[in-house]
From Swiss-Prot:
Catalysed reactions, semicolon-separated: Hydrolysis of (1->4)-beta-D-xylans, to remove successive D-xylose residues from the non-reducing termini
Record gene name: Xyl5
Primary site of residence: secreted
Pfam families in alphabetical order: Cellulase
Listed name of the protein: Beta-xylosidase
Family note: Belongs to the glycosyl hydrolase 5 (cellulase A) family.
Biological process terms in GO annotation: glucan catabolic process
Organism this protein belongs to: Phanerodontia chrysosporium
Classification via InterPro entries: Glyco_hydro_5 (IPR001547), Glycoside_hydrolase_SF (IPR017853), Glycosyl_hydrolase_5 (IPR050386)
Keyword Nucleotidyltransferase annotated: no
Alphabetized Gene3D superfamilies for the sequence: Glycosidases
Domain of life: Eukaryota
Length: 476
C-alpha cells in the first residue's frame, strides 16, 4: 500500500485516483475536552485534582483505562460500517513531553496512539494526526489546555521550538505508516499578528520533511481555521499540502439567529460562509480539507419535549452542509465521534457508572453554562449582563473589539473569562471529589462507561453521514 498524496485540488492514491476522506474527529480522547466528557475547565486541571484526591497511581490508572476503553476494535468496526474511511486523531502534547522536562520524549505517549492507528488500519480506515494542544496554548480556547484566553504559544519562541521538536519525533516514528493520511501540525491557531503562524508553518514543514518526505500535511488557517488572507504565496514553499478549514454554522447551535428551515436564503448563507473560508485556496487551485464541522444536539434532560424538533432542525443544517461539500467533492471530518450526549455520533448511556456518578454535577454545569461550546446561558445571563453593560459604557466603542473578534463578540469574551475560566476553576475540585474512596475496580468500571458497548447511537446523525458517504462513493 502506498501513501496518499495531494495533487492539485485532490487527494489521490498511488495511481492518481481521487480519494475523498469522509469521517470524524476522535475528540475528547487523547485531548480531553470539558463538554465532551463532562468535567469543568481544562484537562491539566482535572488531572492534577484527581491525583490530589485519589493519589497519583490511581489517577494514572483511571486515565489510562479511559484511553483504552474510549476507542476499541468495536468502535472501528461500527465506524467503518457507516461507510466512513478516515478518523482525525487529536492529541495533547503532554502525552509526549512534560512542561518540567521539555524535549525529553515520553515513549508511553505512543501506546494508545499506535494502538488506535493500527485498529483503524485493520478496518481500512485512514487516520490524520492532529496536534490539538501546544505548550502555552496555540489558541484562545479551552481545548488548547492552557487555562487562559491568551494564546501564549505565539509569544514564546521556546514553546514553538518544542513543538518543532515534537513533530520531528512524530515524523520519525510514523514515516513508514501508509494508513496515516497525513499530519495536521496545529489545530485552530489564533495568531493576532498573522505572520508568526506562517513563519512557524515554514519551520514545521521543513522539520517534518527532514524525516518524512511522504505524508501529506493539513495546515489550518488562522483564527480557528477560518482565515488564510495573510498566507500570500506560501503555498509555493509547501508541497504535498492540503489546507484545512473548520466550517461550523451558527444555525447548528443554540444561539442560531432563527429557526433553520432550509430556505434559499439560509442555504445561501451556508454556502457563502464556506466559500469565504476557502477563497485563498480556490484562487490558487489548492486542495481543501474540512477538518471540523457539525451541529450540537438537544438532550431530553434539558430541552424536554422540544428535543426531537430541535434535532431534526440540526439534521437539516447538516444535510445542507454535506450537499455543498458533495458538489465540491470535499474531504471532511465531522466533529465528533463520541461524547456524553451533546454532539457525538455515539454517546455514553445515562445508565453507566460515569453518568450516574456525575448526573447532578452535569446538570449544574449546564445550568451555570460553564462550558463555552454550544452554551445556553439563559439561566445565568442576568448575572453577567451588568459586567457587559459596564464595559460597553466605560470603554470607547473602537476599543471594544479585541482579537479574535469578530469570532468573539464582547459578550463572548466576558463569558469565556467569567464563566468558562473563573467559575469553572472553582468546580474542578468538586468534579474530582466524586472519585474519593473509589477502589481500583470501581475506577475501572467508571472508565469503562466510555466503551462502545456502553454507548448509544445517534441514529439520525449517523444516517445523514452514511447517506452522504454513499453519495460521494457513487460520484453523485
Amino acid at each position: 500500500m502506498a501513501y496518499l498524496k495531494v495533487s492539485g485540488t485532490k487527494i489521490v492514491d498511488k495511481d492518481g485516483n481521487e480519494v475523498i476522506l469522509r469521517g470524524a474527529g476522535l475528540g475528547g480522547w487523547m485531548n480531553m475536552e470539558n463538554f465532551i466528557t463532562g468535567y469543568p475547565g481544562c484537562e491539566f486541571q482535572i488531572r492534577a485534582a484527581l491525583a490530589d484526591v485519589v493519589g497519583q497511581e490511581k489517577s494514572e490508572f483511571f486515565f489510562d483505562k479511559f484511553l483504552e476503553y474510549f476507542f476499541t476494535d468495536a468502535d472501528a468496526a461500527f465506524f467503518k460500517s457507516l461507510g466512513l474511511n478516515c478518523i482525525r486523531l487529536p492529541f495533547n502534547y503532554r502525552h509526549f513531553e512534560d512542561d518540567m522536562n521539555p524535549r525529553v520524549l515520553k515513549p508511553e505517549g505512543f501506546k494508545h496512539l499506535d494502538r488506535v492507528i493500527d485498529i483503524c488500519a485493520k478496518h481500512g480506515i485512514y487516520t490524520v494526526l492532529d496536534l490539538h494542544t501546544a505548550p502555552g496554548g496555540q489558541n484562545t480556547d479551552w481545548h488548547s489546555d492552557a487555562g487562559t484566553h491568551i494564546a501564549k504559544f505565539w509569544e514564546h519562541k521556546d514553546f514553538q521550538d518544542r513543538v518543532i521538536w515534537l513533530w520531528e519525533e512524530l515524523a520519525q516514528h510514523y514515516r513508514d505508516n501508509t494508513w496515516i493520511a497525513g499530519y495536521n501540525p496545529l489545530n485552530e491557531p489564533t495568531d493576532p499578528y498573522q505572520t508568526r503562524l506562517i513563519a512557524w508553518y515554514d519551520r514545521v514543514y521543513a522539520a517534518i520533511r527532514k524525516h518524512d518526505p511522504h505524508h501529506a500535511l493539513f495546515l489550518d488557517g488562522n483564527t480557528f481555521a477560518s482565515d488564510f488572507s495573510h498566507f500570500g504565496d506560501a503555498e509555493k514553499r509547501w508541497e504535498n499540502t492540503a489546507y484545512a478549514i473548520h466550517d461550523y454554522s451558527v444555525f447548528g447551535f443554540p444561539a442560531a439567529p432563527e429557526p433553520y428551515v432550509s430556505s434559499e436564503a439560509q442555504r445561501r448563507r451556508l454556502r457563502r460562509s464556506y466559500e469565504k473560508k476557502r477563497e485563498w485556496m480556490d484562487a490558487r487551485g489548492l486542495c481543501v480539507w474540512n477538518g471540523e464541522f457539525g451541529p450540537v444536539y438537544a438532550r431530553r434532560e434539558y430541552e424536554g419535549d422540544l428535543t426531537d424538533s430541535i434535532n431534526e432542525e440540526r439534521y437539516r443544517v447538516l444535510k445542507d452542509q454535506l450537499e455543498i461539500y458533495n458538489k465540491d467533492r470535499l474531504s471532511w471530518s465531522i466533529w465528533l465521534y463520541k461524547d456524553i450526549g451533546f454532539q457525538g455520533m455515539v454517546h455514553v448511556s445515562r445508565d453507566t457508572p460515569y453518568m450516574t456518578l456525575f448526573r447532578d454535577f452535569l446538570a449544574k454545569k449546564h445550568r451555570l453554562a460553564i462550558d463555552a461550546w454550544g452554551a445556553d446561558d439563559s439561566a445565568v445571563r442576568h448575572v453577567y449582563q451588568p459586567l457587559i453593560d459596564l464595559i460597553k459604557q466605560e470603554v470607547k466603542p473602537e476599543h471594544q473589539e479585541l482579537y479574535p473578534a469578530p469570532v468573539w463578540k464582547l459578550s463572548d469574551r466576558v463569558g469565556r473569562l467569567a464563566r468558562n475560566i473563573l467559575v469553572s476553576e472553582f468546580l474542578v475540585r468538586e468534579w474530582a471529589e466524586h472519585f474519593r474512596g473509589k477502589s481500583t475496580e470501581e475506577l475501572d468500571a467508571i472508565a469503562k462507561s466510555f466503551a462502545f458497548e456502553n454507548c448509544l447511537h445517534r441514529d439520525g446523525l449517523n444516517k445523514v453521514l452514511t447517506d452522504n458517504a454513499s453519495l460521494v462513493a457513487q460520484g453523485a
